[in-house]
Design a protein with these regions (language model features):
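Transmembrane and membrane-interface helices of multi-pass
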Residues: 1-306
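Generic structural signal of hydrophobic/aromatic residues within well-ordered alpha-helices
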Residues: 81, 90, 94, 112, ...
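Intrinsically disordered, low-complexity coil segments
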Residues: 99-101, 253-266, 334-366, 521, ...
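Short hydrophobic "helix-edge" motifs at membrane interfaces and signal-peptide entry regions
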Residues: 164-165, 367-369, 596-598
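Alpha-helix initiation and N-capping motif
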Residues: 186, 210-213, 309-316, 333, ...
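Short alpha-helical interface patches
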Residues: 201, 210-217, 316-324, 336-350, ...
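Membrane-interface segments at or immediately adjacent to transmembrane helices
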Residues: 282-374
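Solvent-exposed soluble domains appended to multi-pass membrane proteins
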Residues: 351-364, 374-377, 382-766
Length: 766
């Protein structure tokens, strides 16, 4: 209760000082300005709020220096209230140097001082520059009070945005301080809202949340306790200082006088400055690419880290710029539909559609309806592509030596070191991240209800559909996306209680046992999508049993000293040990399926590489083009396997390298399943565009080019360019139709959390 007591005393002091000053003004035959009284009341209302909130126990009091922070904040609020009512006494003294008749400076630094002396407008702008600092603190400190890890340039950018907006509002409202003060208060409210959202969800307020404000308001009173921290209290103090500085800026600045000779010119000047400032900020946030140009990126798995390191406004702007899907040039729904129809017809006329092999596979599929199991194996990749890690490493041997696959090869993905959900999105929908821009995670942003996907497709064929992921259902918003996709059920960590674990993660084999259980319970055709968890980073846990540990004796001759010393080599050891366990689990699973008296197809692939191969790639592969160099990092491997003889297929593990967006089409083509028009278009696209991901694309001559650096002027390059343009058009139609219903209404309810043994958002950011 001492928070309420201190605030009540502060409020009493404010009332006393304001009344005393008002009495003194009247005693001198003066008049108390209503605006001055209004400012004082505003600061007093802060204290009244603290008194009430503290009285009902909603102000934290158990933090270090709580007593000091409460006294300091109330002293600031009382001081601001008094400075407002006494402004006619204080301002002339503080800004005496700015009076037009102030004596010219002499002595040292006279020229520098001359820039301020006798120039009241300059003094007003200086007040606003300082107000921007305190407004920034008023917004940030509530939830982000450790400034030791904030990037200085990002904070400087945030201050510049706030300050220029304040200056623009100041001049727009003809040099009055109310408008910039309202902005400072609005930023404070935003900071408090950010504090509550972080408290409840361990996530910041993000652009996508703006479309759910009404929903948030509806549930705000259900089960939440809106207790504020002492840093929120301190933010009030900073905001009050910002507001006071805005008030004083309005006092010192020269104002337009009606009827004066320069009144019209001053009006136009004010409006011009306002337009330049407000228009400049608008142009800045719309024309400058924060992600690619300024390097301000939001780490979407744990976005809170980005918002804390880069400042709320820069991170929010970067995220807002990224989420709007790029609309292809001259896009129209009719044109996109016509393009899709053209590509689908081209497939229908092709050998791939008319061949005897495809006909036989279709007849078999229609009569047999095999169960289809899709396994996206967490961080499964073959590091032997990096010169065998200069340690004789040969990769996962069982996986690499499977000789009876329908198809296998390199899989070019749109994720590296993380971003599982984007690889999943590409496989499930046939869409490519190459057409959605940088830093985008469709599961968390876009409306998936109308997006075609494999679960929906198999359900239309009479299949039951199951998704499983042995971690939190809320991660990457899967609980909502899987409903939108139409899965019949979603098995999450709650369905794997007591399952075997490795390094605290549910093992691959445990998920395979769950699949076998589902097959045993239901003889009807099923589509099962398994997103494993065993191999997730980090790789410095030290939790591997001794009998499962591998060690690579890597030749470190050409590696950086930092790579040798920062634990990367031990990370490699733990990672390849996990991959070995995945390889053995895959052997176990396929052997078990081989013994079943039912037809089963398995498509298995890795979602991305771990986070460290770039250190080896840059040192060991130095004389190659940029596209080849980069794509080595953005590839894993896939297999499509069946426990029966698929009609029309030799099943000799024919190599067919492709990208994740084509993988589901490849699966359906090989097993004889019906293709959607979009999948038929994929088959046609592959003739000119064999692979594409967020980094680059491959043309028909098997030449890679970076997406940002189109090369080649031959027929293959031209065909690939045309195919990319048509693909972007078709994908926009498939996802967004006319572009009026782009964003999801089913938002992620909890922060992402790697550790399935902890509540969402528990892991603290380092």
């Amino acid at each position: 209760m001492f928070a309420a007591a201190i605030s009540l005393v502060g409020l009493a002091a404010t009332v006393y000082l304001v009344l005393r000053e008002a009495k003194a003004i009247r005693a001198q035959s003066g008049t108390v300005a209503k605006s001055a009284l209004g400012w004082s009341v505003a600061f007093g209302l802060f204290q009244l709020f603290l008194t009430i909130w503290g009285a009902i126990g909603l102000v934290a009091q158990n933090e270090p220096l709580a007593f000091v922070m409460l006294i300091l904040t109330n002293a600031i609020l009382t001081g601001c209230a008094w400075a407002s009512i006494a402004r006619d006494r204080i301002a002339p003294r503080v800004f005496a140097f700015a009076k037009p008749d102030a004596p010219a400076p002499t002595g040292k630094l006279a020229r520098l001082r001359g820039a301020f002396v006798g120039k009241p407008l300059v003094a007003a702008v200086l007040c606003l520059l300082l107000a921007g600092v305190f407004a920034l603190l008023g917004m940030e400190v509530s939830s982000n009070h450790d400034f030791t890890w904030v990037y200085p340039l990002c904070i400087l950018l945030e201050w510049a945005i706030i300050t220029v907006l304040m200056v623009g509002l100041f001049f727009l409202f003809q040099r009055h301080g109310v408008a910039p003060a309202v902005l400072a208060f609005a930023l404070f409210v935003l900071g408090i809202a950010e504090f509550f959202v972080i408290t409840f969800k361990s996530m910041p307020i993000q652009p996508g949340d703006l479309s759910a404000i009404s929903t948030a308001a509806a549930v705000a009173g259900t089960g939440y306790t809106f207790s504020i921290s002492l840093f929120c209290v301190l933010s009030m103090g900073f905001t009050a200082i910002a507001m006071l500085l805005c008030e004083y800026a309005g006092l010192v600045a020269p104002h337009r006088q009606k009827g004066a000779a320069n009144a019209k010119r001053m009006l136009l000047t004010n409006l011009l400055v306002a337009v330049l400032c407000l228009g400049g900020v608008t142009a800045h946030v719309t024309l400058i690419d924060y992600y690619n140009t300024l390097g301000i990126t939001v780490y979407t798995w744990r976005p809170l880290e980005s918002y804390w390191r880069e400042g709320y406004l820069p991170a929010f702007i970067s995220a807002a710029q990224s989420i709007k899907p790029p609309k292809p040039a001259d896009y129209s729904v009719d044109d996109a539909k016509a393009t899709l129809k053209k590509y689908a017809k081209a497939y229908d006329k092709s050998d791939a559609a008319k061949s005897d092999e495809r006909t036989a596979a279709k007849e078999q599929f229609d009569s047999e309806k095999p169960t289809v199991i899709a396994i996206m194996n967490e961080t499964f990749s073959d590091l032997s592509i990096y010169q065998n890690m200069r340690a004789g490493y040969e990769g996962p041997q069982y996986f690499k030596n499977l000789s009876n696959c329908l198809s296998r090869g390199k899989l070019y993905v749109s994720a590296y070191g993380g971003g599982t959900a984007n690889t999943e999105f590409e496989f499930m929908t046939g869409n490519s991240m190459a057409n959605l821009g940088s830093g985008v995670y469709p599961y968390t942003i876009y409306n998936m209800e109308t997006t075609g996907n494999l679960a929906e497709q198999f359900k239309s064929l009479g299949y039951s559909t199951t998704a499983m992921h042995p971690n939190h259902a809320t991660n990457w918003n899967r609980e909502n996306v899987y409903k939108d996709f139409g899965f019949d059920q979603f098995l999450s960590i709650n369905d794997f209680q007591g399952a075997d674990t490795l390094r605290g993660m549910v093992t691959d084999q445990a998920t395979y046992d769950k699949i076998l259980e589902l097959l045993d319970q239901n003889a009807d055709p099923q589509f099962i999508f398994d997103v494993t968890m065993q191999n997730h980073s980090g790789y410095d846990t030290g939790l591997l049993p001794v009998d499962k540990q591998m060690h690579l004796n890597i030749d470190t001759t050409n590696l950086d000293a930092k790579t040798i010393e920062d634990g990367t080599l031990s990370d490699v050891d733990e990672y390849v040990s996990c991959i070995e366990q995945s390889d053995q689990a895959l052997r176990y699973f396929l052997n078990a399926l081989s013994k079943l008296d039912r037809k089963v197809v398995v498509v298995f692939w890795g979602d991305h590489q771990p986070f460290f191969p770039s250190k080896f790639n840059d040192k060991w592969f130095t004389n190659e083009d940029d596209a080849t160099h980069q794509e080595r990092l953005w590839q894993t491997d896939y297999i499509i396997w069946a426990n029966y003889d698929v009609a029309g297929c030799d099943q000799t593990s024919e190599v067919d390298d492709l990208s994740t967006n084509y993988l589901s089409t490849q699966l359906m083509q090989l097993i004889g399943a019906p293709l959607t028009d979009y999948q038929k278009a994929h088959m046609t696209l592959r003739e000119s565009l064999p692979a594409i991901n967020s980094v680059g694309y491959e043309d028909a001559s098997l030449r890679w080019a970076l997406s940002s650096n189109v090369t080649g002027d031959d027929a293959a390059a031209a065909a690939a360019t045309k195919a990319r343009e048509d693909y972007a058009k078709m994908q926009y139609y498939e996802m967004f139709r006319d572009g009026k219903n782009v964003y999801t209404e089913h938002f992620q309810t909890e922060a992402n959390e790697t550790d399935p043994n902890l509540a969402p958002g528990t892991t603290k950011i380092k």
